[in-house]
Amino acid sequence: MNLLTTKIDLDAIAHNTRVLKQMAGPAKLMAVVKANAYNHGVEKVAPVIAAHGADAFGVATLAEAMQLRDIGISQEVLCWIWTPEQDFRAAIDRNIDLAVISPAHAKALIDTDAEHIRVSIKIDSGLHRSGVDEQEWEGVFSALAAAPHIEVTGMFTHLACADEPENPETDRQIIAFRRALALARKHGLECPVNHVCNSPAFLTRSDLHMEMVRPGLAFYGLEPVAGREHGLKPAMTWEAKVSVVKQIEAGQGTSYGLTWRAEDRGFVAVVPAGYADGMPRHAQGKFSVTIDGVDYPQVGRVCMDQFVISLGDNPHGVEAGAKAVIFGENGHDATDFAERLDTINYEVVCRPTGRTVRAYV
């Protein structure tokens, strides 16, 4: 029996996909499944998303794109992080769309002797991370337009402040993106399918849906903007089996450095999840776990393999083997856990690693 598990609810994934498909309306729905489907397991999750309405998939790396083809995904797949030095020809041969994120990437594709290459141009509209810069637009557009083996399917960009719906930076980026799109079309690139909406923009700015939307986090049932609810169902639960319960005397400490000491005689329990499994060491004293509907605070330093919780005088009789929910079903949700750790729910669902075993329900 596994001591540490992430339970993935595939029915929740299916439900979320249907909700997002309906919200997308006439726009195509691209599912972002990078980072092993946000740590939910792409081999199980992607087929469910495909079966319930996704028109396309987006990933970061070539390996992720190839994996989608290996598991039978037939929809369009867009890969946006690759280098000209990589063997990207194999991806082209498997009908994977490649992002043009710089003039060097454009040149590498233009110089490739493939018969047909589908590309999408990524525009840097203000995030200043990756994407073709404004001073490079004209040169890249004209070069791609002159390459007969290149099919430019569209353009996309990434929004810096979409999780702040009132931030004017989003509209400034959209103005820049539309300027790039107009220039591309002036150079003869039709760019029929364009997209700017990640999860927060998709859920809060229907005026920006364009021809396709590109949510990621929302597929896994998490809300990207605080205070906004869209009927999504969280798919991940991170839980562990209590390994031992022991008595502790008043004044005694626990874990390295004895940074926490019991005020009264009582009990502590050990939960086998440590920083080797994705539980951050700096989480000391910031969160609680839920056992049979009761919250118990984490105390002392988080160790490599385990952390400690205080049971008080253990009125509910917690014993070894009890299920401790770190976040998810019957416990605090991932967003609450993230807030306690001063981070975001995107990171939290990517944390369970190490000896955590994924189980599907």
UniProtKB/Swiss-Prot annotation:
GO biological process, one term: peptidoglycan biosynthetic process
Listed GO CC annotations: cytosol
Keyword terms: Isomerase, Pyridoxal phosphate
SUPFAM superfamilies: Alanine racemase C-terminal domain-like, PLP-binding barrel
Annotated GO MF terms: alanine racemase activity; pyridoxal phosphate binding
Binding residues for substrate: 129, 304
Enzyme class: isomerase
Family that this chain belongs to: Belongs to the alanine racemase family.
Protein name: Alanine racemase
Source organism (scientific name): Corynebacterium glutamicum (strain R)
Lineage: Bacteria, Bacillati, Actinomycetota, Actinomycetes, Mycobacteriales
